Each structure stands twice: as structure tokens, then as C-alpha cells.
Amino acid sequence: AVNEVKPDFAGFIIEVPSSRRNLSAEQVKVLVKGLDKEILPVGVFVDARPELPISLLRDGSLWAAQLHGNEDEEYIEKIQNMTGKPVIKAFSIKTPEDVQRALRSPADYILLDQGTGGTGEPFDWSLVPPVRRPFFLAGGIGFENLREAISTLHPWAVDLSSSLETNGKKDPVKIRQIVRMLKQINTLEAFKKERERDI
């Protein structure tokens, strides 16, 4: 289903035993080989030894590393310097200060999340001022609030997982529906910008 609808990214949770979606580095290498070349593979890590994301980025298995632990600036810069590949750093947003901390990150992209994971509840979007740097939005985003999330915060990308599942497994029907919906929203947003320019 993923290859059929071609989302921009496909995320793989790597060596995170606490996640039910956990995969080994070897499993990811196999899955990525079957991924359409237009889809960028992203490895999701939580406080991994830096050698793990570095090796998968260097061998071409991954386009980017998405970090969800307590990785500091030194860790982020080490991955960037040793691979030349993008780093996405996730931040739990509970206060305006959390947003400012995220904006100061040396990561190539920041990911704004509600932080507790899997609750299906978004964080308070009013905490996010207009953001100039490209960011990913995650946490509690699904069919019912996707349009509002994009029109309110204008993220560069949205990170979806639980909302694409049925009984804990990725649902091909939901994946198709949400990608179609995202493409419609993006077309509408582009149309609005064109009209604003013409006025």
C-alpha cells in the first residue's frame, strides 16, 4: 500500500525494544530494498548508540535519522558531520519554552510532538508561533483534524502512525485515504497562496 500511494517518507522504528513497531537494522535494510525509490526512508531512534544511525545513513539504507530520545546537540552534530544526511529531532511541546528550545536545535528539521506517544491527543497548537524553519508535526493527528493542523500551523510535513492503523497494524485503506487527503489539502493550500498573490 505504501509503494502504491507514494507518501514522501516511510518511517522505521529501529532497535527500540519498548515499541511494538520495533525492527532490527537488518529487517530495515530488507524493507528499504522493497520501498519505491521516490519514498524517502527515515529511521526512528531513541537514545541509540550513534554508530547505529550513522551506519544505516552511510550505507544508503536511510535518508534521515529521526531522534526521539535525549540526544543532545553534540550527538546531532556528530551524525550530521559523519554522514552529511539530515537529522530530524523530536521535541515534546508542553510550554512556549519547549518550542523555543526546538527552534534553537542544530537538527536539519525539528519535529513538534505532544510527547507521551500513542494517546491520540494533539498538543496545544496555540503554543506554536509562526515558524520559519521547516518542521514536522506529530501527535494525535488523524482524519478528523489533519486539515485544521495544516491550515493552522503550516508544517513542512506531518508524521502519522497510530491513525493509519487498525488493530495495531498499518491499514492499507487508511494509508490510501490519508495520502489522498494530504494531496488534496496541499493542492488547496497552493491554490490559496496563488490567489493571495493575485489579489
Model-derived segments and spans:
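Conserved N-terminal beta1-alpha1 strand-loop-helix module at the mouth
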Residues: 1-199
